Amino acid sequence: MNGSADAGPRPRKYVFITGGVVSSLGKGILTSSLGALLRARGYRVTAIKIDPYVNVDAGTMRPYEHGEVFVTADGAETDLDIGHYERFLDMDLSRGNNLTTGQVYLSVIQKERRGEYLSQTVQVIPHITDEIKERIRKVAEEQKAEIVVVEVGGTVGDIESLPFLEAIRQFRFDEGEGNTLYLHLTLVPYLETSEEFKTKPTQHSVATLRGVGIQPDILVLRSARPVPEEVRRKVALFTNVRPGHVFSSPTVEHLYEVPLLLEEQGLGRAVERALGLEAVIPNLSFWQEAVRVLKHPERTVKIAIAGKYVKMPDAYLSLLEALRHAGIKNRARVEVKWVDAESLEAADLDEAFRDVSGILVPGGFGVRGIEGKVRAAQYARERKIPYLGICLGLQIAVIEFARNVAGLKGANSTEFDPHTPHPVIDLMPEQLEVEGLGGTMRLGDWPMRIKPGTLLHRLYGKEEVLERHRHRYEVNPLYVDGLERAGLVVSATTPGMRGRGAGLVEAIELKDHPFFLGLQSHPEFKSRPMRPSPPFVGFVEAALAYQERA
């Protein structure tokens, strides 16, 4: 940590973030923002998300219920908050950074079956709580973190969270008061009718937290508008928290404002003080510039996302963030027009895409809306509108090209039509004998070998890159030569994949198009505010150019 080099190693610090009153207050953004403030002070930080559900991971959950599944470099299917952590901290996390009830109980039961608890009665305390603490410490050690920020999902008072709250309570007993900090995020509603903030829900939430043995050191009050100083002092008095340790987190236009807003109020210094750390002035210049561009862009461009889950934008959270990062890089604001892919099957496409300068077809599963996505890809190809296809979006582009350019009537994916005469998209050979759904796809970082002279090579500026993946189907290698003869450019492959000759198709593009790119990977998962994804930067740049021509 910061300080004298001869002071010797210092104890690791732990910050535990809980939430009260209602769920979905933004604990993930608060955790990410605090992590960013500590990183800006030069500390090595990691963040862990605790999810109290019994699922082992988020891989099989419905996007409409849980939002996107974020994939880590090591192939874990995790909660979307892990994506927030990676973007704000600008670092790769791992499967250990998302801890679930399912993982904990599965591990404890397996240990019991192996005889590791021989002669013991296995109980929530100490066996479950010890497993939780062991997993948190293991991540901290593996990632060489000086400060570990742990978000406890759910709401204080939920029965599912009790073992985790007990485990983090024990951390103070194990590590000492100066090495642990409890931060509680809670709702302070503002009543328009009486024009006042109501603090009673927060008081009850803190009382519930104290009932399980945790006295919060810091409170962050979530509200639609800034909570005034006198209200914060009242909350401090009734919750036994220092007045200078109660902060306001109002709704903001851009989430990248949150670290700046909290730092301006002194949250970073309060955490330093509570953990016995030296005062360090953070370097927040990037965040300040990013917010300036978002609030005062030089240009604005509209992109259509033709997807299946358009009524739940969180299902495409990393896509939206990657577009935002690309917009910042191009000093532009990216507006998104949500287009229900199913509606495109019979829609007037001129009307559906009338005011957009780019079309993006995201990843997804299932047959619903597929033909609408095919029509969107055809429209982009024929009208020379910039097109970016992600995962399924690449497969859609190949299906459309095969049908309408290569002359393969009825071409399709075996996922949607098992009896198609031309299975240009087919199940990967490695997936033929896979049983079960959870964690069984081609997941995580895989290498892409890029062909020189292609659009993709211009975007990345190198011949091999790593990108995240999450798929079971691929471009059928038996059709690649014929598609290339018809004019499709295979601009990247993964070398050495079994039974594929030149390798699994990772990217396709068109020569006679200003920007038509399909990627089997999910580059949005590696896009960061400081290091935006090259395909997204190029896509937004092309959309801006198209807008100027139009």
UniProtKB/Swiss-Prot annotation:
Q: What is the superkingdom listed in this entry's lineage?
A: Bacteria
> What does the entry list as the binding residues for CTP?
S23, D158, I159, E160, K198, T199, K200, P201, T202, Q203, K234
Originating gene: pyrG
Question: Which Pfam families has this protein been placed in?
Answer: CTP_synth_N, GATase
* Protein name, UniProt field: CTP synthase
Which residues are responsible for catalysis?
Answer: C391 (nucleophile), H522, E524
* A GO cellular component annotation in the UniProt record: cytosol
Which GO terms are recorded in the biological process aspect for this UniProt protein? 'de novo' CTP biosynthetic process; pyrimidine nucleobase biosynthetic process
Family according to the record: Belongs to the CTP synthase family.
Q: How is its activity regulated?
A: Allosterically activated by GTP, when glutamine is the substrate. GTP has no effect on the reaction when ammonia is the substrate. The allosteric effector GTP functions by stabilizing the protein conformation that binds the tetrahedral intermediate(s) formed during glutamine hydrolysis. Inhibited by the product CTP, via allosteric rather than competitive inhibition.
Q: Which residues hold L-glutamine?
A: Y64, G364, L392, G393, L394, Q395, E415, R472
Q: Cite the binding residues for ATP.
A: S24, L25, G26, K27, G28, I29, D81, V252
Q: Mention any additional remark.
A: CTPSs have evolved a hybrid strategy for distinguishing between UTP and CTP. The overlapping regions of the product feedback inhibitory and substrate sites recognize a common feature in both compounds, the triphosphate moiety. To differentiate isosteric substrate and product pyrimidine rings, an additional pocket far from the expected kinase/ligase catalytic site, specifically recognizes the cytosine and ribose portions of the product inhibitor.
Which HAMAP family does the UniProt record give? Answer: PyrG
| Region listing for Amidoligase domain, in residue ranges | 1-277
Can you tell me which residues bind UTP?
Answer: S23, K198, T199, K200, P201, T202, Q203, K234
Q: Which organism does this record belong to?
A: Thermus thermophilus (strain ATCC 27634 / DSM 579 / HB8)
What reaction is this protein's catalytic activity? Answer: UTP + L-glutamine + ATP + H2O = CTP + L-glutamate + ADP + phosphate + 2 H(+); L-glutamine + H2O = L-glutamate + NH4(+); UTP + NH4(+) + ATP = CTP + ADP + phosphate + 2 H(+)
UniProt-listed InterPro entries: Class_I_gatase-like, CTP_synthase, CTP_synthase_N, GATASE, GATase1_CTP_Synthase, P-loop_NTPase
Instruction: Could you list this entry's UniProt keywords, alphabetically sorted.
Output: ATP-binding, Glutamine amidotransferase, Ligase, Magnesium, Metal-binding, Nucleotide-binding, Pyrimidine biosynthesis
List ligand-binding residues for Mg(2+).
Answer: D81, E151
Q: How does it assemble?
A: Homotetramer in the presence of UTP and ATP. Is in a protein concentration-dependent equilibrium between monomer, dimer, and tetramer in the absence of UTP and ATP.
What does it do?
Answer: Catalyzes the ATP-dependent amination of UTP to CTP with either L-glutamine or ammonia as the source of nitrogen. Regulates intracellular CTP levels through interactions with the four ribonucleotide triphosphates.
Which pathway does it take part in? Pyrimidine metabolism; CTP biosynthesis via de novo pathway; CTP from UDP: step 2/2
* EC numbers for this chain: 6.3.4.2
Query: Which is an annotated GO molecular function term of this record?
Result: CTP synthase activity
The residue ranges of the Glutamine amidotransferase type-1 domain are: 302-549
